[in-house]
Amino acid sequence: MISKESKMVFSKFNLEGKSALITGASGLLGQQHAHALLELGATVILTDISMERLQLAKDKLSQSFRSELVVIKVMDVTKKDDIVSVSEELADQGLRLDILVNNAAIDPKVDKDEGLKESSRLENFTLDQWNLQINVGLTGAFLCSQVFGSRMASDGRGGVIINIASD
C-alpha cells in the first residue's frame, strides 16, 4: 500500500494529458524512457528510422499500456525536413508536445550478432563513424530542440527538453 506521503510525491509527477516525443525510441533506453513516461500517464510518440523496430517497440509497450497511448513516427533526426514533417503531422492530429526526449544515438560498441566490436576503440574509429555520431547525437538533438522547442514555446505553455548523452 502506498503511503499518503508517497501519493503526494507521485502526484507531482503526474503526466496525464501530456505528450512526450522520444527520439531513438526503438532502442533499449528509448523503450525504458517510454515505459517510465507511460507509467506516469503520458502519451508517448516514439520516433526512429525503422518502422519495423518502432512497431516492435509499440507492441512490447502495448502489453503493459493502452496502445492508443503509444504513437509511432518514422523520423531521421539528421534530416530537418523529417523533423518538420513529424511536427506538422502531430499538430494536424491535435497532439500538443509537452516533453521532448533527445535520446537518438549511434552505438558502435555492440552488435547484437557480433558482440563487442573492435571498431569502437578510438584508434580504430573512422572519420565517417565520427561524423555519424556527431550528426545523430548532437546535430539531431539541436534540430529536434529547434523544431519541437519552437512549437512548444509558440503556445505560451512551454515544455521540457531532456537531452540524453552517453558518448
Where are these regions (language model features)?
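Catalytic Tyr-X3-Lys loop
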Residues: E118-F142, I162
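Canonical Rossmann dinucleotide-binding motif of NAD(H)/NADP(H)-dependent dehydrogenases/reductases
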Residues: F10-I45
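Residue(s) in the substrate-gating loop at a strand-loop-helix junction
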Residues: S166
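Amphipathic alpha-helical dimer-interface segment in Rossmann-like NAD(P)H-dependent oxidoreductases
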Residues: D92, L132-G156
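Conserved glycine-rich Rossmann-like NAD(P)H-binding loop of the short-chain dehydrogenase/reductase
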Residues: A42-L56
